[in-house]
Amino acid sequence: MAYTIIVHLLAKNDASCIQKLKDKLVEASQVYSKDPETLSWFVMQDFEEPRRFAIVERYVGEESQKYHLENPYWQTFDPYVLPLLEEPMDLRRLGELEGSVM
């Protein structure tokens, strides 16, 4: 059963903040996708509200998240991203249901 984290982010209502957040999320996806035991690390932007973004992180198991947290890049992520946000990140931790199909 994969361990999944879904994060919703809302950028400040400023074109520069939106673009900076978008660029940082794409960069983060390229970095974190290479971490051991990371199944996928997707970033998405809302079609109707371009200030809204989502991250879907999938790991082999909950303990696999340690590789993500030990990645030196992680230390740069929050300090860069948090000032670009209108509100705190909404982070949810989930376990994929057995028998579900991708």
Predicted segment positions?
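Eukaryotic N-terminal low-complexity, Ser/Thr- and Lys/Arg-rich leader segments
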Residues: 1-3, 101-102
